[in-house]
Swiss-Prot record:
It holds the Pfam family LYTB. [4Fe-4S] cluster binds at C15, C99, C198. This is 4-hydroxy-3-methylbut-2-enyl diphosphate reductase. (2E)-4-hydroxy-3-methylbut-2-enyl diphosphate binds at H44, H77, H127, T168, S226, S227, N228, S270. Belongs to the IspH family. Its cofactor is [4Fe-4S] cluster. Catalyzes the conversion of 1-hydroxy-2-methyl-2-(E)-butenyl 4-diphosphate (HMBPP) into a mixture of isopentenyl diphosphate (IPP) and dimethylallyl diphosphate (DMAPP). Acts in the terminal step of the DOXP/MEP pathway for isoprenoid precursor biosynthesis. The active site is at E129 (proton donor). One of its GO terms (molecular function) is 4-hydroxy-3-methylbut-2-enyl diphosphate reductase activity. The lineage of its organism: Bacteria, Pseudomonadati, Pseudomonadota, Betaproteobacteria, Neisseriales.
Length: 322
């Protein structure tokens, strides 16, 4: 043995929301046959999307591309009220694969709006989840904040009737800084009853921080358009080590590992384990022979499928436990 080691982060890869979203598309294809139309990539991973496309899924952005009476699935990121209304008017058979933790944020937005609160959204402009959440209200009713610097530029109607929500896949540390800035500028701003950043995002970022303390380099398996995968790479890099994100093993470069004795490997919440295994095989082939699993939070959450797609014996759990 040469002492060169690969340490696998735990937890890593698929979260409950991603697992549910993929299963909804697969079950819809089994029940109703191809094509099944999916509004936006169901999750942000090229391997997953290509695999579903081969099975008969058709990924679209505009509902005008969907024929009357077709089966339509909303992506895990959620959709706006306008998209929901158009789908209803056109009579599609709709299955909502929105992550339940994103749906929780949508419900919070509706509750706050009913109380006449102006709402600030912490998130990345253009991300599908942000568009879906901000689209729960009429255009212009929510304010978007991406950085601490944006907080100083905010113009609000009434600082005493103000609240915020956030995208579920953000950097935990950066979001804390933005929240601190919001609370400093608007002391009466309402905070969510429960943090909006999801358990999977938090757990994976915590695990990669621990990984970065033990390793000389961290590899994150994830697609370029995956928000949570990008945040994992950034978190690792912020610890002062080399960190790279790869869609699959073919993107690895042997020179990255020269002089590195300990390699950390993790995967974004939308990246399947098969891609992790391919990355491991490649790195092992370059001389890092030992592989061990890191410790970390155990995840046992399972999100139920829509009742129309459940099989016999699949029941709705009373509670989703971590």
């Amino acid at each position: 043995m040469n002492g060169k080691t690969i340490i696998l982060a735990n937890p890593r890869g698929f979260c409950a929301g991603v697992d549910r979203a993929i299963s909804i598309v697969e079950r819809a294809l089994e029940e109703f046959g191809a094509p099944v139309y999916v509004r936006h990539e169901v999750v942000h991973n090229k391997f997953v999307v290509d695999n579903l496309r081969e099975k008969g899924a058709v990924f679209i952005e505009d509902l005008a591309e969907v024929p009357p009476g077709a089966t339509l699935v909303y992506s895990a990121h959620g959709v706006s009220k306008a998209v929901q209304q158009e789908a209803a008017e056109r009579g599609f058979r709709v299955f909502d694969a929105t992550c339940p933790l994103v749906t929780k944020v949508h419900k919070e937005v509706a509750r706050l709006d009913a109380q006449d609160c102006e709402i600030i959204m912490i998130g990345h402009k253009g991300h599908a989840e942000v568009e879906g959440t901000m689209g729960q209200l009429a255009p212009g009713k929510m304010l978007l904040v991406e950085t601490v610097g944006d907080v100083a530029k905010l113009e609000v109607r009434n600082p005493d009737k103000l609240a915020y929500v956030s995208q579920t896949t953000l950097s935990v540390d950066e979001t804390k800084d933005i929240i601190a800035a919001l609370n400093a500028r608007f002391p009466n701003i309402r905070n969510p009853h429960k943090e909006d950043i999801c358990y999977a995002t938090t757990n994976r970022q915590t695990a990669v921080k621990e990984l970065a303390e033990q390793c000389d380099i961290v590899i994150v398996v994830g697609s370029p358009n995956s928000s949570n995968s990008n945040r994992l790479r950034e978190v690792a890099a912020s610890r002062g080590i080399d960190a790279y994100m790869v869609d699959n093993a073919s993107y690895l470069q042997r020179t990255w590992f020269e002089g590195k004795s300990k390699v950390g490997v993790t995967a974004g919440a939308s990246a399947p384990e098969v891609l992790v295994r391919e990355v491991l095989a490649t790195i092992r082939g370059w001389g890092h022979e030992t592989v061990r699993e890191g410790g970390g939070a155990e995840e046992s959450i399972v999100f139920v499928l829509p009742k129309e797609l459940r099989r016999e014996g699949e029941t709705k759990p009373d509670l989703c436990k971590r």
